[in-house]
């Protein structure tokens, strides 16, 4: 049989004398079945297309499945076509709709209802773009982004897309550092007009925080209602002089306290946002944790360690028992810096001496009272002071038992047994 007869039927021969390899589509099989329905014999159809009659009978049994496959493929795949050329992935990523170039300059107005294009136009990045648009819509509804014309009225007509985006990102960074959306406007109004004092330092920000009682930005107080946590009607008005010092209308003692805390701040800027809202004000905790030392006395390491440990135990409610030994070790060392300072012996309490003054050692006594009442018990002293290695021989065990026995009868009995 001539091989050229199979060219119109999409059948190719590998070698002569072999049955031709069939590369028939479901549409070809349906056409062969239709020829049998039209009156042709299965033998003639099988000779024409080059398949056995048994295979043709199997096609007739699966006629419904073959017709369903033809409907699924569609009109483009009825014949045997070459597969489409493969395209690289970066070509799909670079294909953007032409409407993407004509975006509005103020990208805050982009929402799900104001999309200038359908998400189906994007082949790859539709999910990521929808996430970004939803984030913009969420922040816009919650008031996190301030409109550009409110803060910079002179630059209301900015048409550059990148400058607008950088401006909004700077606002977000300012809000996330240490402020709430309500305090941003307060700080903008509180900036001095003179060129000498344009920078507001961190003590001034802490003064503003302690005066206005604004809670710092955290997960807990961000979800609360801002009207509940801001009581601006009961707060006295602030008056700033030319040196940018906060002044009270009727009281002068809080001013001295605030200035003293501003000179020696107890908390850095990095630890301020880490304190959650339910804990008290850091300005109120400062005299309790670390009282102000005189200028001529050098700060000691034990005071700083005691303050840090006490603060840490307050945060965790002193629930860890192993810190009792650390408190005992801290209390055994004297807190005075010079040789003329008073020395504190922890064994004074056991020997009947007077209890040490709380003003001299505030942190050690507070740690001992907070952490463990068993810091100076017999078990702790025996486990830590008895550092000799134990001899496990028979004679040493007997001597240990005789030396540690509390009744004279047992000691006499043990000595008689040894003799």
UniProtKB/Swiss-Prot annotation:
- Limits of the HTH psq-type domain: 15-66
Q: Which SUPFAM superfamilies match?
A: Homeodomain-like
Q: Where in the cell is the protein located?
A: Nucleus
Q: What is its main location?
A: nucleus
The record's listing under InterPro entries reads:
Homeodomain-like_sf, HTH_Psq, RD_transcriptional_regulator, WH-like_DNA-bd_sf
DNA-binding region listed in the record: 42-62
What outcome is recorded for mutants in which this gene has been deleted? Flies exhibit partial transformation of antenna toward leg identity. Ectopic expression causes partial transformation of distal leg structure toward antennal identity.
Which Gene3D superfamilies does the UniProt entry name for this protein?
Winged helix-like DNA-binding domain superfamily/Winged helix DNA-binding domain
Does Nucleus appear among the keywords? yes
- Specify whether Phosphoprotein is a keyword of the entry: yes
- Give any single GO term for biological process: compound eye development
Name one cellular component (GO) term. Answer: nucleus
- What are the UniProt keywords, alphabetically? Developmental protein, DNA-binding, Nucleus, Phosphoprotein, Transcription, Transcription regulation
In the record, what terms sit under GO molecular function?
A: DNA binding; DNA-binding transcription factor activity
Q: What stretch or stretches form a coiled coil here?
A: none
- Where in the body, by tissue, does this protein show up? Coexpressed with dan in the presumptive distal antenna, but not in the leg imaginal disk. Both proteins are also expressed in the brain and the eye region of the eye-antenna disk. First detected in early L3 eye disks in cells surrounding the newly initiated morphogenetic furrow. Highly expressed in evenly spaced clusters of cells anterior to the furrow, lower levels within and posterior to the furrow.
**What PROSITE patterns is this protein classified in?**
HTH_PSQ
Q: Enumerate the residue ranges of region (Disordered).
A: 333-359, 378-419
Q: Which Pfam families match?
A: CENP-B_N
Q: Which PANTHER family match?
A: PROTEIN DISTAL ANTENNA
Q: Please explain the role this protein plays, according to its UniProt record.
A: Probable transcription factor with a role in the retinal determination (RD) network. Regulates ato expression and is required for normal R8 induction and differentiation. Danr appears to repress Dan expression, but Dan is required for Danr expression anterior to the morphogenetic furrow (MF). Dan and Danr lie downstream of so and require dac function for highest levels of expression.
The subunit structure is: Interacts with itself, dan, ey and dac to form a complex (or complexes) containing the RD factors.
Full protein name: Protein distal antenna-related
Source organism of the structure: Drosophila melanogaster (Fruit fly)
Q: Give the gene name.
A: danr
């Amino acid at each position: 049989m001539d091989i050229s007869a199979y060219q119109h039927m999409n059948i190719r021969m590998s070698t002569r004398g072999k049955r031709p390899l069939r590369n028939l589509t479901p549409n070809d099989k349906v056409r062969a079945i239709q020829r049998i329905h039209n009156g042709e014999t299965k033998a003639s159809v099988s000779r024409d297309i080059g398949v056995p009659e048994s295979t043709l009978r199997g096609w007739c049994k699966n006629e419904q499945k073959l017709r369903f496959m033809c409907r699924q493929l569609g009109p483009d795949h009825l014949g045997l076509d070459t597969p489409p050329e493969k395209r690289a992935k970066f070509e799909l990523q670079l294909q953007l709709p032409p409407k993407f170039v004509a975006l509005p300059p103020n990208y805050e107005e982009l929402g799900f209802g104001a999309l200038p294009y359908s998400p189906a136009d994007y082949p790859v990045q539709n999910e990521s773009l929808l996430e970004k648009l939803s984030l913009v819509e969420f922040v816009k509804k919650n008031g996190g982004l301030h409109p550009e014309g409110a803060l910079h009225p002179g630059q209301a007509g900015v048409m550059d897309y990148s400058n607008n985006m950088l401006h909004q990102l700077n606002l977000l960074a300012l809000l996330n550092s240490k402020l709430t959306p309500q305090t941003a406007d307060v700080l903008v109004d509180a900036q001095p007009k003179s060129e000498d004092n344009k920078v507001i330092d961190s003590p001034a920000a802490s003064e503003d925080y302690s005066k206005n009682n604004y809670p710092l930005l955290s997960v807990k107080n961000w979800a609360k209602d801002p009207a509940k946590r801001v009581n601006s009607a009961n707060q006295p008005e602030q008056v700033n002089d030319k040196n940018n010092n906060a002044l009270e209308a009727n009281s002068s003692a809080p001013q001295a306290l605030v200035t003293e805390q501003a000179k020696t701040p107890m908390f850095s800027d990095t630890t301020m946002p880490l304190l959650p809202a339910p804990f008290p004000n850091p300005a109120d905790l400062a005299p309790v944790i670390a009282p102000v030392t005189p200028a001529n006395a050098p700060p000691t390491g034990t005071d700083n360690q005691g303050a840090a440990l006490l603060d840490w135990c307050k945060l965790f409610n002193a629930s860890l028992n192993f810190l009792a030994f650390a408190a005992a070790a801290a209390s055994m060392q004297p807190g005075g810096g010079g040789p003329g300072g008073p020395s504190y012996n922890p064994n004074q309490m056991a020997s009947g001496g007077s209890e040490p003054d709380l003003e001299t050692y505030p942190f050690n006594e507070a740690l001992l009272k907070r952490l463990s009442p068993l810091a100076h018990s017999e078990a702790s002293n025996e486990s830590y002071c008895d550092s000799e290695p134990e001899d496990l021989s028979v004679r040493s065990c007997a001597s240990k038992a005789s030396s540690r026995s509390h009744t004279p009868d047992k000691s006499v009995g043990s000595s008689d047994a040894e003799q």
